[in-house]
Amino acid sequence: VKQRYLLLLLIAIGYIGGNFIVDRWEKTLYYGDSNGYYLHVVSFFVNQDVGDYDQTITTLRQVNPDSSDPREDVYGIRLTDKGQRYIKYTVGVPLMETPFFLLAHAYAKLTGQYPADGWSKPYLLAVGFAIIFYVLLGFYLLIGILQRYFSPQITALVVLSLAFATNLFFHATYVTMAHGFLFFDYCLLLYLTIRFYETPSTLRALGLGAVVGLITLTRVSEIVSALIPLLWGITSRETLRERIRFIGANLKYVVAAPVGFLLGFSLQFAYWYYVSGHLIFNPYEGEGFNFLKPNILRGWFDFANGWLIYTPIMAFSLLGWPLLRRYCRAPQLAILAFVGLHAYIHYSYYAWTYFPGLGSRPMVETYPLLAFGLAASYQYCSERKWLRGLPVIALVLFTVLNLFQTWQMRQGIIWSERGNRAFYLETLATLTPTLNSHRAYESNELQPDEADITLVKPLVQQGFEDTTLFATVADITHGGNYALYDTREFLPWKAELDLAEMHPRDWLKVGVSAYIREEDRLHERDKAAVLVVEIVDGNGKKKTWKCIRISPFIGNKAHHIWPTGEVNMWDEASFYVRLPRGLQPNWRANVFVWNAPGQKMILDDLYVELYRDR
């Protein structure tokens, strides 16, 4: 018991301190999914405008003008056929936020020191920290569960690993989305499942159904959580037969559990019916799933927010799953079925990188289940002298990595959901962004240290002086008499380079000078024109295709990945592309500007140079 409270105290200190260090609690509820969930609460309790949301959104934008208007977002607040507006996010998170909201609301009204509008500091503090309360409560339950099967030492290592070496920390300190709340829900489900099979009762069956309903109320796709109580304890054909006999002899439980589920999910039925006139309603229309092509491997291993790339300690959990037959057989089948189906559903979603997150966020709610595999892996190591120190080393190493990368996300050094291999390697262990990290982010090409390469020769210099070929301007130029001001998607020119005399692993440096007028200021970085290097073989087959957005480099002396470009100044956008190892004499390179969005920008002095390693 003493160890449990010491662990909880340590986690509480780390999470509360982390929340203040990350220092997003005053802004989190104003943006993104965190805002989408919280709008339910403010609308219901403060403005009573459910189904309209005008007053709620108006007050939001009055206190924080930078907040986007979800009515203007194609995937934001939309209209039903009934003419009511609806929020696509289900009401599980708002329900769990409500007690903390009401505390803040009472404080604001009683003291009169803050507006009782749902957006002032007491609300931001109380609701922003609610997720930490639920995570701590989840850990309280999980510690007790694990100690049934594993030693206090193994339990402590597992709990500290989940708390500080995984992206659960990010989701408890950086955002207030569903996943931290679901962590608690799943811990509660495990606790009730174990208690039910120890001493079955109608009340406990009702409770199990209600918790599955609450989990589904939080994210509808989490209905697969029903597999956990269904499959728990099935370890052989004989135990499967026993389970079937148990269900057949206790139909009252079969009735009670679905009744509990309907009670737990009833609030969502009520909301859907109110806004749409239907009990069953698809709020994610247009945001589809492709169940024929799930992206499980990419979701776990891609540098664009891949789960195990940014949360590598959980590889121990996967490796520990087979070992559960030795240490803890009861959850093994439930883990396999639940995690497998959970991953299949979530990585069939069209936006499988799941912005935002430091590592794929749908896996966070699976951690109460995956804790068993992690414990089995640690137990296996502890029984072998040559592996005994590995769990502690892993805990320390991956905690440092996780906390450091959380800080990097906060500083804008990394952006995991838009990451790539080159960007990951360029930013690993860096304290500030660099020009090369920005180039790598844009191009997914590792960039050379310029001290390690030497210029061989210039290859191309295009000043856009031919006014018969290009749309030009003469009043703003970088060099010469004219500069390019052409919004066509493709120019009637590209640099075509013969690569016959070049060596494999040589470098092409490609750059262009750019200028944005005040009236042409760009507000969305994904609508920027790009500078492209394309390498093709003798048959015209593409072998390499690399590009960078041009305007984010303008005036970006800090080399951050967020800017769209400063106005009224010239600057250069450039990057290096390495020629492939298998380079053949008949291959060629094409260099061109691709302006699919039709960005208005002045370009001048495009160049290509050949470099070679010293």
Where are these regions (language model features)?
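Extracellular and organelle-lumenal recognition/adhesion modules and their flexible linkers in secreted
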Residues: 444-614
